Amino acid sequence: MKFTKIVETCIYSTKLKEMKNFYINNLGLDFVSEENGRHVFLKAGKSMLLIFNPESTLKDSNSIFPVHGAITPPSIVHFALEINIEDYEKWKNLLQKNQINIEKELKIGNSKSIYFRDPSGNVVELITANAWPVDN
């Protein structure tokens, strides 16, 4: 047996409105659903980015889902979104146009990455296809 893919990535933030606006308006993720003060669910290609407010999910004992979250120490997450190499400069220009600070750019082999932070300090990476041997 083998897993077929990672379906969702969960991050935690008390700034749900800012995070929703950041990912939709700056990165073009698609809105799926939200529960005011608890979560925002966004679609990123063929996977989901789930943003939870840990102040709600840590005490959410009546939910059908297990209690989860991270507040102390602040949870800083890193995740990567795959982009086409042909769109690399377009993405870089879009980030600059939206005044998003690019912390680092890397080129390793044939792969290129751009690193920046979202409003909650999570490290977001835009990485070109074929960086990892997952499509083989």
Which residues does each predicted region cover?
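Short, flexible, mixed-charge acidic loops at enzyme active sites
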Residues: 55-69
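Short, charged/polar, Gly/Pro-enriched secondary-structure boundary elements
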Residues: 47-50, 59, 121-124
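Core segments of cupin and vicinal oxygen chelate
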Residues: 12-56
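Mid-chain, well-packed structural core segment of small domains
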Residues: 80-92
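Vicinal oxygen chelate
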Residues: 1-2, 92-136
